[in-house]
């Protein structure tokens, strides 16, 4: 499959609390500008004919409705925090529409947390109506995503739940043990899918992943990136990078740290995400960034992302 150019739609640019924050009366939280309304961080990527989601937090349902999306070929998880995984139950609608299990790509430690946090998904025999997930375990090595990576058709049986329909018409339960739901990601390459390049970072001490799709990279919830990872970020047109606030933070990049990284990586455009209400309203923030980048000679155009932004 020819990968071609990637197109990224920003579905959410907020912190774990979103913006506005419950009970806050600051200028940003009371702003009428839609660009100051921020769902939890997430992105939708169209790449090589595939529809790919990065992270499915508590706002997943509203984000899918806002962007008028009804099909996903893959869901990539950056890490195991609830603001990035808390909406995964809502893939049930996609299971029903597509008649396919949702293809979820995550690291082993994330999978272990999903098993604890969504026990009904992994319980056997399966509870009728539980989401259908097919897990691909990834690490920091490039991996392949293929369209309809599972060719098994889901059939809903009322009061019983989903079954797979075999080519001969026989119906079998979707999963009878964990091994039926989990496999290692495909690192073999080939021409019948798209290659995704993971970027290792750390969220304080927690290992997390960002992802590169062609000339677009999406990084969130990082406070450090190992030196050996920067080679994966060369030649970018667009970089999306988390920036939680002005002050140094133990698990997120501050604005000063982000501007240093934007200059070091040198993407044509750097978009800031995972933004808190401590930054000013959108228009003022844009002016502030323009001035700061000019003063520091940052070799990238740095702007705040906003929900609904499309970059390509």
List PLM regions with ranges:
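Binuclear metal-ion centers of metallo-dependent hydrolases, dominated by the metallo-beta-lactamase
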Residues: 149, 165, 226-312
